[in-house]
């Protein structure tokens, strides 16, 4: 995959997300290597948990932790690692871990990909149980890994998510 050819934004309202970890596939953490374009197994998580959403990043962005901006893509199906999915941001999960601040943009597929998410405009439109599952996952997925921890500090709205995306684009350029 030539990541250089994939833009951060498909248009003003849509972001391109490169999927690293499919939802509900088991306790495996994959990482996309930006230089080679390969997906590597980063580690086998010690908890028996799987990601509640497809997990990836926005190319050509840089968050405060030095990595590309992270995104959780709410979907009905797992998406293959390395796939690019066009999404709309609806909010952000605010958290910190042993390395510092680590926000996760929450996004849904665009109408062209799945019309069943058209009614979700903001974070409050998501099912409350899904939000609880996301928080539970991130509060516990590192529990059995020595020296690792996560603290979820709350949720922010779509405007904050878009601000973090734009800051990430600016920081990377």
UniProtKB/Swiss-Prot annotation:
It comes from the Bacteria. GO terms for molecular function: inorganic diphosphate phosphatase activity; magnesium ion binding. Mg(2+) 2 binds at residue 70. Pfam families: Pyrophosphatase (PF00719). Its cofactor is Mg(2+). PROSITE patterns: PPASE. The keyword Membrane does not apply. Keywords: Cytoplasm, Hydrolase, Magnesium, Metal-binding. Its main location: cytoplasm. Belongs to the PPase family. Catalyzes the hydrolysis of inorganic pyrophosphate (PPi) forming two phosphate ions. This is Inorganic pyrophosphatase.
């Amino acid at each position: 995959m030539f990541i250089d050819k994939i833009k951060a934004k498909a248009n003003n309202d849509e972001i391109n997300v490169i999927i690293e970890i499919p939802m509900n596939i088991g306790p495996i953490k994959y990482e996309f290597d930006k230089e080679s374009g390969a997906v590597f197994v980063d580690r086998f998580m010690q908890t028996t948990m799987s990601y509640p959403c497809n997990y990836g990043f926005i190319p050509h962005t840089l968050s405060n932790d030095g990595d590309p901006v992270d995104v959780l893509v709410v979907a009905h199906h797992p998406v293959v690692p390395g796939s690019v999915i066009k999404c709309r941001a609806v909010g952000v999960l605010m958290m910190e871990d042993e390395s510092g601040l680590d926000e996760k943009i929450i996004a849904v597929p665009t109408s062209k990909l799945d019309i069943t998410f058209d009614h979700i405009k903001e974070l409050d439109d998501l099912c409350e149980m899904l939000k609880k599952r996301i928080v539970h996952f991130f509060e516990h997925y590192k529990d059995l890994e020595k020296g690792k921890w996560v603290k979820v500090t709350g949720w922010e709205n779509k405007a904050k998510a878009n601000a973090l995306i734009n800051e990430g684009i600016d920081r990377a350029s």
